[in-house]
Amino acid sequence: MTQYTRNILACFKQATQSEIDHGLTWYADAKSDAQSMADKYELPLHIVVGVIAALSPTNRWERNLIDADNMLGVFTSGGYVESCTPCTYKTMRDKAWSILSSTPHDADAVAFILKGPKITDFFYCIMGEDVCVIDGHAWCIANKDRRTMQEVPSIGKKLRQELQTSYSRAGKKHGMTAYEMQAATWVAWKRIHNV
């Protein structure tokens, strides 16, 4: 067992039952929210989840859903991308619009448009794949090191894979997926460190 896995498990041990329950349902709830939008706008689920993932950087979850719903409404009513003002970067807005306008045929085609590892993993987590998002918080948990997001070092491909493997191993010890473990520890970490 790696030190990363031990640290993740140490954080998990501090999680309340409510935090564990939240971790077990967060991505399923997110998928359900996306499915509701897919039904509302008569769009494939993978496209809606791709839009949500694209609009996620620097965006709070509640606002992310509002922004995605607004963009889907503009798109399906024949509007223009310039009418959309999500709480994220313009490049991410344009990426979300690109997913809508190119109508990718499957999840992997959406992931190709998303490109970035963090948002691609977020996309796959919502779709139900057993991966996890490695962001600054996930790094802090695995390193047992509270830092601001600006202080977290760059997470390269090798480190991302090591951390994902560690979350997967920690999850398996408790009958959870990697993303369920990551979600549960993230909620516990937020409480413990008042983040």
Question: Can you say where each PLM-predicted feature lies in the sequence?
Answer:
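HhH-family (HhH-GPD) DNA N-glycosylase catalytic core used in base-excision repair
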Residues: 1-195
